[in-house]
Amino acid sequence: MKIFISIILLAIGVYFIQPIWSEFLSVPGTFRGDGSERIVVFTADDCGVNCRDAINYLNRSGHAFEELVLDNNEQNLKLFQQLGGSDVVPYLSSGYQLVSGFYPQDYLSVLAAARGLAILDPAMKKVYTQHFDANKNSLLVMYGTSWCVDCAALREYCSVRKIQILDWDIELDADAAARYEMLGGRSYPLVFYGARRMTSFSPEALRRLMKI
């Protein structure tokens, strides 16, 4: 059973929903008043090229977002920490998605989740459609290997809880390997639930990814 605690921070206009499940307490997420995902990116004056590239990328996307600078701003720093931030900027939150650092393909996943697959070019749209069923419902998919420890942990977690997952071994499946490269995979497992992306496994991260 889900209990929702809503926190409205009027000073910056961000709507946070913090879910409490019986098994764990999640970090908050960033949402609009209507429940849609809201993109917030934290930066710092000394961040340099990574923060500039992140902001430029989001500006070019045309999608609304908020930049919150951490320098000399206790409120922004507190939010940053509440959302799981530590020592890496830029740090992006969109709904329950979190991205540490700037990786274009991670940001593209955030935008696709927020705006739909129509924003993708034909090649990337073809990749992302593999993460949905024929009725356009999100599928849980994993790009992994047979030897990856976290991949095995995710398989076991899903098996015990009867969570359906498409398990692609990129060392055996050439098509999956090609998609993994196009998606900018950097480690294993690379997990998607529809357009939403997860780059490492933990039970909390999976629940946040699937909003369950």
Language model features: what each stretch is:
Residues 2-20:
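Hydrophobic membrane-insertion alpha-helices, especially the h-region
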Residues 20-28:
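Aromatic-capped interface at the extracytoplasmic side
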Residues 28-64, 127-163:
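Local sequence-structure signature of Cys/Sec-based thiol-disulfide redox active-site neighborhoods
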Residues 46-49, 72-75, 97-100, 146-149, ...:
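Solvent-exposed loop/turn segments at secondary-structure junctions
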Residues 52-60, 78, 105, 109, ...:
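Solvent-exposed, polar/charged alpha-helical surfaces in well-ordered, non-transmembrane soluble domains
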Residues 68-87, 168-187, 210-212:
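Thioredoxin-like thiol-disulfide oxidoreductase module
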Residues 75-98, 102-105:
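Mid-chain, structured segments of secreted extracytoplasmic proteins
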Residues 94-123, 192-212:
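Non-catalytic, surface beta->alpha helical segment in thiol-disulfide oxidoreductase systems
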